[in-house]
Amino acid sequence: MNIFKNLCIGIGVLCLASCASRTPVAQEMELTQYVHPNIGTVHSRWFFYTPAAVPFGMAKLGASTNGTYGNEQGWEAVGYDETHTSIDGFPCMHEFQIGGILLMPTVGTVKNIPGKLETPDEGYRSRFDKKDEYATPGYYSVLLKDYQVKVELTATERVGFQRYTFPKSDSSHVIMDIGNKLGESGNVRDAYIKQVDESTIEGYVVTEPEYVKKYQAGATVPMYFYAKLSQSPNSVNVLFRGKDLMEKTEIKGAGAMMVLNYDTSKDQVIDLKIGLSYTSIENAKLNLEKEAENLSFDEAKALAKEKWNDALNRIVVSGGTEESRIKFYTGLYHALLGRGLASDVNGAYPKNDGSIGQIKLKQDGTPEYNHYNTDAIWGGYWNLTNLWAIAYPEYYNDWVQSQVIMYKDGKLPKLAY
């Protein structure tokens, strides 16, 4: 009852915030310059470091230094650590208890395990130098030293973009490690990956996070993807982690992986667009088509920067030192990053019982609101709900609607996965 009372109070705050007039800013400031995503990344949580994302997005991309280790209890520090010197891949999804769709470009002999930080040569991970790494809201890049491959990441709300610039090699690869434990996602219960045609890969992974085991035994979290390649691979292999390569284009089961093989020229660029969804492969495809079918990497990068500047300019501070502005806007950036979309462009969303719900559509065919399912009312403990209501009322409206629809579906969450 107290939770429901707090929710009603929140709705009242929303009404006040929505009715409040906002004085338009004549010209937006370039506030992304004050956001330093690498601050606080030593011993940080899985969902903390996702520079290649837009505010409140589903697609949250970043580098992982030990995400493939998994997470024994569901809350330990894992993912990206500023003190680490090698990278084990670039996941597309980072949320509380959710991690999936890891990609890694390599050159040379294919290795079928990620390897450890202490012994990077045993796996497909690569060393990197901090001087070759760059992170800003909406974009990330790094040079993988062991392969001399430059990796760039950006995103729209539901689509991840990965760009690889390869050296000249007749043994360039893109490893898609789909069916293995990643970050806080827990053990994999099922996975599937298939080459649909020369330029399309699709699949899913179903995980059982540790917190789900504790609080809703038997439930699982599925993640679906639909990826388009800018260039077709010369050949494709599949395998289960640690096993020999097989000359097939489809594989199912925990541990499933796919390797795309290329013969690359010097500075050859290969782009991937990865549509994401919590409901189905079909909706992952639809999300890609609606948000990014005709969008280039550079266009997506520019749009992401614009979205971040728009969001950060909701609160403009003056005076103080540059260090203080960096602290403020980096904190605001994290307040807008960690609560992600769960619904698709057509209004489909994952219900607590494992079925698929449908948000009512407006006359133009778009959903009446977006569904968000991360952290739920925990945000109230950190005063995030007040921040959203005052500065981001359109998001707060969707957030409240998300809590209400979960209540109507049978739960009013303290946490939602």
Please describe what each predicted stretch is.
Residues 24-417:
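Accessory carbohydrate-recognition regions in carbohydrate-active enzymes
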Residues 1-9:
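Bacterial N-terminal signal peptides that target proteins for export
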